Amino acid sequence: AWFHHPDLPGVLPHTFSAPPEACLVAGGFVGDRFQEGMALLPRLAGMLLMVSDKGEGRVRAFSDGRADMKYTFAPGDVNRIKQGLVAVAEVLQAGGAGRLHVPVHGVSPSNKPEELAQKLDDRAIRDFTLYAAHPMGTNRMGTDIEDGVVDSWGRAHGLENLWIADAGVFPTSLGVNPQLSTMAIGHWVGRHLHTVLGG
């Protein structure tokens, strides 16, 4: 289940299913708090927050083959994460939650969404436990090499035999789970590649 908050475009809170230990770690129950989390597990509910980020990054290769990766969050991304967590807290409280735990360093459990909002106010991005799923827009489709990495058929600009058919060819993050869209891109590129290769 998921919901769109009208005031939070690009933020998609939804339920998720994961092994109990993964839920505890995602909820900040690590180290000394893991035992506390295990005791709460029968009464614990969680939600996931997907954010269509606007930050930018790059990957370069060093001459020795190592990768140099840089990513910078846009200020609005951090604010939308905070607002999204408060929206999730409101939903969970409406469903009967008594205490609200978030995976943010230095933020203790809250009893009300308003209290959580105050605690999140001065938190920096480094305080949040984040991970990337379904990366998109890393090999954008575009009409030429200045506009994108691949053409509209998935062929890399400037390379004869490199085709890309995954979520990386989207122009940006879709803000939703991209499984169906990725399958459609794979089918599109695959059919064209089959034709080009004379299949």
Predicted regions and their residues:
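FAD cofactor-binding and catalytic pocket of flavoenzymes
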Residues: 1-92, 124, 132-135, 157, ...
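Short beta-strand scaffold segments in enzyme catalytic cores
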Residues: 46-48, 139, 186
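Structural signal for hydrophobic packing residues in well-ordered secondary-structure cores
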Residues: 85, 89-96, 190-197
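A conserved FAD-binding loop/helix module that cradles the flavin
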Residues: 172-193
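Active-site-proximal substrate-binding core of FAD-dependent oxidoreductases
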Residues: 102, 109-110, 191-199
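A glycine-rich dinucleotide-binding beta-alpha-beta segment and adjacent secondary-structure elements
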Residues: 97-173, 179
